[in-house]
């Protein structure tokens, strides 16, 4: 007998064949009309939120963050140069879209720290992520030995320093020592060490 969390996970793995697909399509319509960062009462994917550390208690909130899809382009340079040196179109950013979503959620709630985030959907224009935020000064968080580490000053602004899971991936880390020797402790610091 599958647990309820397993059933939720399986339905998200095969979304187009599952029963929640019509509901998800309706969600996309309403999500596009809503704001870019919206606080939620409960997570859309309960299994994923719980596996990433979410608890339904005081000090924890869930925020849905919306980020545009695709590459970026910078404003066109009006000074003279060869066309091939313009480089204002088809730019790939070093940050992942998920990390950008986490940073925008952290900007909206400056008194909270980002714990983690997970994917909840996309349409033709946007990708949607739900971000787990923790109030670092909440008594319920400080008394919980599993999450009280986030109240340390070393973890302040962790999303901006690439210390979340999405940040680790963007920095070329997160898959052990093998293959990331030149990315540690960071790409910039490693380059300085090799001079």
Swiss-Prot record:
InterPro entries: Rbsml_eL15_core_dom_sf, Ribosomal_eL15, Ribosomal_eL15_arc, Ribosomal_eL15_CS, Ribosomal_uL23/eL15/eS24_sf
Disulfide bonding pattern of the chain: none
Keyword field contains Transport: no
Record keywords: Ribonucleoprotein, Ribosomal protein
SUPFAM superfamilies according to UniProt: Ribosomal proteins S24e, L23 and L15e (SSF54189)
GO CC terms of this entry: cytosolic large ribosomal subunit
MF GO annotations: RNA binding; structural constituent of ribosome
Superkingdom of the organism of origin: Archaea
PANTHER family the record matches: LARGE RIBOSOMAL SUBUNIT PROTEIN EL15, RIBOSOMAL PROTEIN L15
NCBIfam families: PRK04243.1
Family from the record: Belongs to the eukaryotic ribosomal protein eL15 family.
The protein, known as: Large ribosomal subunit protein eL15
Naturally occurring in which organism (per UniProt): Picrophilus torridus (strain ATCC 700027 / DSM 9790 / JCM 10055 / NBRC 100828 / KAW 2/3)
Originating gene: rpl15e
């Amino acid at each position: 007998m599958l647990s309820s969390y397993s059933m939720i996970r399986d339905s998200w793995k095969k979304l187009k064949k599952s029963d929640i697909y019509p509901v998800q399509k309706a969600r996309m319509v309403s999500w596009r009309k809503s704001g870019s960062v919206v606080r939620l009462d409960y997570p859309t994917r309960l299994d994923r939120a719980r596996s990433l550390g979410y608890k339904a208690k005081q000090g924890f909130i869930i925020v849905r963050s919306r980020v545009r899809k695709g590459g970026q382009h910078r404003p066109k340079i009006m000074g003279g140069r060869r066309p091939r040196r313009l480089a204002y179109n088809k730019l790939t950013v070093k940050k992942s879209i998920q990390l950008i979503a986490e940073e925008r959620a952290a900007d909206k709630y400056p008194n909270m720290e980002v714990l983690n985030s997970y994917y909840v959907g996309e349409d033709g224009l946007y990708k949607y992520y739900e971000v787990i935020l923790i109030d670092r000064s909440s008594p319920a968080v400080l008394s919980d030995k599993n999450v009280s580490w986030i109240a340390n000053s070393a973890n302040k602004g962790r999303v901006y320093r690439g210390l979340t899971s999405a940040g680790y991936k963007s920095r070329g880390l997160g898959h052990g020592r093998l293959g990331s020797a030149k990315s540690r402790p960071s790409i910039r610091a490693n380059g300085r060490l090799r001079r």
